C-alpha cells in the first residue's frame, strides 16, 4: 500500500497546490510526434478491416498520437509514420475492425 504517514503526509499537504493557478509556470513544448516521426520503433502495427468498421471513430478519439485520420469516404486510416503500435485503437474498437499484426521490417 502506498500511504503517506506522519511528517511526510503533512509536507505533502503543504506543497500540494489547491488549484491549477497555484502551479508554477512552465514552458510549453511540442509533443514529439508533431516534430518527429515515431513509427520507426513500432513492433506491432494496426490493420483496419473496412468491412467491419462502422465509422464510430472511437479509434480516432483514443489514439494518443496524430496517427489515425478520417478519409473522405468516412473510413479511418493509419499514418504509419506516426503510429507507435500501442494497440489502443484495436483494444477500443467495438467491432474488432482493427487487429494488431507483427511489424515486418
Swiss-Prot record:
It catalyses: 3-methyl-2-oxobutanoate + 2 oxidized [2Fe-2S]-[ferredoxin] + CoA = 2-methylpropanoyl-CoA + 2 reduced [2Fe-2S]-[ferredoxin] + CO2 + H(+). Binds 2 [4Fe-4S] clusters. Its cofactor is [4Fe-4S] cluster. Keywords: 4Fe-4S, Electron transport, Iron, Iron-sulfur, Metal-binding, Oxidoreductase, Repeat, Transport. GO terms for molecular function: 3-methyl-2-oxobutanoate dehydrogenase (ferredoxin) activity; 4 iron, 4 sulfur cluster binding; metal ion binding. Gene3D superfamilies: 3.30.70.20. It holds the Pfam family Fer4_21. Residues 44-73, 74-103 form the 4Fe-4S ferredoxin-type domain. It is an enzyme of class 1 (oxidoreductase). [4Fe-4S] cluster 2 binds at residues 63, 83, 86, 89. [4Fe-4S] cluster 1 binds at residues 53, 56, 59, 93. Its EC number is 1.2.7.7. NCBIfam families: PorD_KorD (TIGR02179), PRK09623.1 (NF007202). Heterotetramer of one alpha, one beta, one delta and one gamma chain. This is Ketoisovalerate oxidoreductase subunit VorD. It comes from Pyrococcus abyssi (strain GE5 / Orsay). The lineage of its organism: Archaea, Methanobacteriati, Methanobacteriota, Thermococci, Thermococcales. The gene is vorD.
Amino acid at each position: 500500500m502506498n500511504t503517506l504517514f506522519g511528517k511526510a503526509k503533512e509536507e505533502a499537504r503543504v506543497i500540494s497546490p489547491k488549484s491549477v493557478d497555484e502551479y508554477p509556470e512552465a514552458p510549453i513544448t511540442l509533443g514529439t510526434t508533431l516534430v518527429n516521426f515515431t513509427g520507426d520503433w513500432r513492433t506491432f502495427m494496426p490493420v483496419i478491416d473496412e468491412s467491419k468498421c462502422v465509422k464510430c471513430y472511437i479509434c480516432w478519439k483514443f489514439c494518443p498520437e496524430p496517427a489515425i485520420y478520417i478519409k473522405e469516404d468516412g473510413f479511418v486510416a493509419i499514418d504509419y509514420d506516426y503510429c507507435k503500435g500501442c494497440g489502443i485503437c484495436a483494444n477500443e474498437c467495438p467491432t474488432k475492425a482493427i487487429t494488431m499484426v507483427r511489424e515486418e521490417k
